[in-house]
């Protein structure tokens, strides 16, 4: 754990709920130097494997008890809903709706990639070359990682970075101060479904 920590408390009760370690610039620079290897590990999986991982991760995100930290603690779906509601002030019903939106992205990743890639075969992500409407095309990621700064007031916004994993691009996530729960749960669902842990910096 870091010396620089953020204590999360319940909005109504003021009760301490979690203590979150904060990264310093040195740790971030160190992690960024490792992103090339993280990208290699993620891109070693085929497009089909990555899409299968997304399907499995969606079910895990919605229903499973997932790791919470490196100390063996875990969190059920109901605990996630309750904790997020307490730290963000969102009602349980809105948290559940956002969970369903995120599940829809996991479950519908093939269609999302189809839209992002304008109908090109997803296999072009792993080979780098393909054909679209009779025209040769080339796919080459312009970065080894996608950096994402997230808010505290909308769990559903996490769905915008999820396709990066299916495209073989690791993510560096800076969660909102009161809402580390959703990106952490998505990340743990991906890992439990078979995605390399190196694909995530959090």
Which residues does each PLM region occupy?
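N-terminal Rossmann-like NAD(P)+-binding subdomain of aldehyde/semialdehyde dehydrogenases
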Residues: 1-131
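Rossmann-like NAD(P) dinucleotide-binding subdomain of oxidoreductase/dehydrogenase enzymes
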Residues: 118-202
């Amino acid at each position: 754990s870091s010396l620089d920590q953020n204590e999360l408390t319940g909005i109504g009760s003021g009760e301490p709920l979690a203590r979150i370690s904060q990264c310093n610039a040195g740790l971030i620079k160190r992690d960024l130097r490792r992103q090339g290897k993280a990208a290699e590990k993620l891109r070693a999986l085929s497009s089909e494997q990555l899409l299968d991982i997304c399907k499995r991760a969606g079910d895990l995100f919605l229903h499973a008890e997932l790791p919470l930290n490196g100390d063996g603690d875990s969190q059920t779906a109901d605990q996630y809903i309750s904790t997020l509601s307490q730290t963000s002030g969102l009602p349980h019903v809105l948290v559940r709706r956002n969970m369903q939106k995120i599940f829809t992205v996991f479950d519908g990743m093939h269609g999302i990639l189809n839209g992002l890639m304008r109908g090109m075969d997803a296999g072009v992500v792993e080979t780098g070359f393909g054909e679209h409407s009779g025209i040769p095309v080339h796919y080459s990621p312009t970065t080894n990682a996608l950096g994402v700064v997230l808010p505290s007031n909308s769990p559903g916004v996490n769905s915008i970075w999820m396709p990066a994993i299916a495209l073989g691009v690791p993510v560096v996530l800076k969660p909102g101060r009161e809402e580390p729960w959703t990106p952490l749960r998505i990340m743990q669902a991906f890992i439990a479904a078979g995605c390399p842990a190196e694909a995530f910096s959090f």
